[in-house]
């Protein structure tokens, strides 16, 4: 009987201790969340920034140098590249040479240390971030999908898109056939980070997003490097369709990905 009373008494205490531990962990996570939310981004609109409108897509890197703020090692040194509107350029070279950094400077994920990057003659630092990034589409190796439906994930490229626009983007990305074979079609849930889809299917959603956004400037950063040969063939057709009449910067190691580029630029380890 004594042991029974002890058990009855201890059980609520154990539950209370577990609740206190959960509360402490939750508070710690919430504090970290607030820190992230309240963090001011380093890259912001300058006073008097203007909107980028009526974009033709002429891109110029003028004597650009760059190093990260926490590292004095130079990543890029006096790089000059001119990409006429509607033309395509491929960047090739060893890993760590600065190819992705070059692409990241265009939408101002980072700012140049010296020199300037321009679109249609306008320094990207003089433009509002929203208008600048609205004119640039990106397809990367790693695709982030939300835990929602295929329809919702495609619409991320243009939140106010109509159902017809979403389906047209999917068709142009060569994914309409596999969607129509799914029981719920466009209302199929993709799972967290797209776990219910193959690598090729996830990449096609990423491409459909850009078709929907319809930007004049396109960045393809190792878009097919993680795919098998069969998936790459399907994706490559979609990418070629996507790049038509757009200023395109492609980073890739496979010849099949860059062979149609108007110009190939080799980036060395010294940037």
Regions found by a protein language model. Give the residues of each.
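Small-residue-enriched core segments of transmembrane alpha-helices in multipass membrane transport
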Residues: 1-9
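A general structural motif at alpha-helix termini
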Residues: 2-3, 37, 136, 154
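Signal-transduction coiled-coil helices of two-component systems
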Residues: 23, 40-43, 242
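Conserved E/DxxT/N motif and adjacent residues on the DHp alpha2 helix
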Residues: 35, 42, 155
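Two-component histidine kinase transmitter core
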Residues: 39-40, 110
């Amino acid at each position: 009987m004594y042991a029974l009373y002890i058990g009855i008494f201890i059980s609520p205490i154990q539950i209370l201790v577990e609740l206190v531990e959960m509360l402490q962990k939750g508070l710690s996570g919430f504090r970290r969340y607030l820190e992230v939310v309240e963090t001011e981004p380093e890259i912001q609109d300058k006073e008097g920034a203007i909107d980028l409108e009526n974009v033709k897509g002429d891109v110029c890197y003028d004597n650009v140098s760059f190093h990260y703020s926490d590292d004095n090692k130079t990543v890029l040194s006096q790089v000059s590249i001119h990409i006429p509107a509607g033309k395509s350029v491929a960047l090739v070279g060893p890993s760590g040479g600065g190819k992705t950094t070059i692409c990241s400077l265009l939408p101002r994920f980072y700012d140049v240390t010296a020199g300037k990057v321009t679109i249609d003659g306008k320094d990207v630092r003089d433009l509002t971030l929203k208008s600048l990034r609205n004119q640039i589409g990106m397809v990367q190796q790693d695709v982030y999908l939300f835990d929602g439906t295929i329809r919702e994930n495609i619409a991320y490229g243009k939140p106010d898109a109509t159902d017809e626009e979403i389906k047209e983007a999917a068709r142009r990305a060569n994914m309409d056939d596999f969607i129509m074979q799914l029981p719920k079609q466009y209302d199929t849930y993709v799972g967290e980070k797209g776990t219910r889809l193959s690598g090729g299917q996830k990449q096609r959603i990423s491409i459909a997003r850009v078709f929907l956004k319809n930007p004049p400037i396109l960045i393809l950063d190792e878009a097919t490097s993680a795919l098998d040969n069969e998936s790459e063939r399907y994706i490559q057709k979609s990418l070629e369709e996507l790049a038509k009449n757009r200023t395109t910067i492609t980073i890739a190691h496979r010849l099949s990905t860059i062979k149609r580029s108007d110009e190939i630029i080799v980036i060395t380890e010294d940037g």
